[in-house]
Amino acid sequence: MEQTFAYYTTIFREDFTLFCKSELQKEGISLGLLYFVIYIGKKPGCSQRELAAAVRADEGYAARSVEKLLQDGFIERRRHEKDKRMAILTLTMKGEKTFEKAHSLFHEWDDKVLSSLQEEEKKQLFTLLQKLGKTKEAHLCMKK
């Protein structure tokens, strides 16, 4: 197969998924649900609708995911103090622990994958990835 950016991103995604799988099983959470925990950890007090938009999930999938995270004790849902019609999501202690674990897992994987690069090369790589992430075309592809 021709070596394209899509090829490499697919390979890295598969590798990252396999790397995380066993550690996440110990935490009792899937990689898909972990992204919900990460967003709530970064934006405590977010709404379910905001969460769905941020992780690019439809509202039905987001609702099922939130229910699963509630049942498994990773998050809690409360009424907004000022707008009682709105519910806000926050992490529980278990969720906080998982959020911290995710942070260390992501850095551990980065360290392993990028170990052959010099510091300057890593900076260049991240600069290029950030530039790609900001392009209009990249976002259009992600929405399809």
Curated annotation (Swiss-Prot):
GO molecular function: DNA binding; DNA-binding transcription factor activity
HTH marR-type domain: residues covered: 1-134
DNA-binding region positions on the chain: 48-71
Pfam families the record matches: MarR (PF01047)
Span of the signal peptide: none
SMART domains for this protein: HTH_MARR (SM00347)
InterPro entries registered for this protein in UniProt: BilQ, HTH_MarR-typ, Tscrpt_reg_MarR-type_CS, WH-like_DNA-bd_sf, WH_DNA-bd_sf
Keywords in alphabetical order: DNA-binding, Transcription, Transcription regulation
Function, in words: Transcription regulator that regulates expression of the bilirubin reductase operon (bilQ, bilR and bilS).
Protein name (record): HTH-type transcriptional regulator BilQ
Protein's organism: Clostridium symbiosum (strain WAL-14163)
Gene field: bilQ
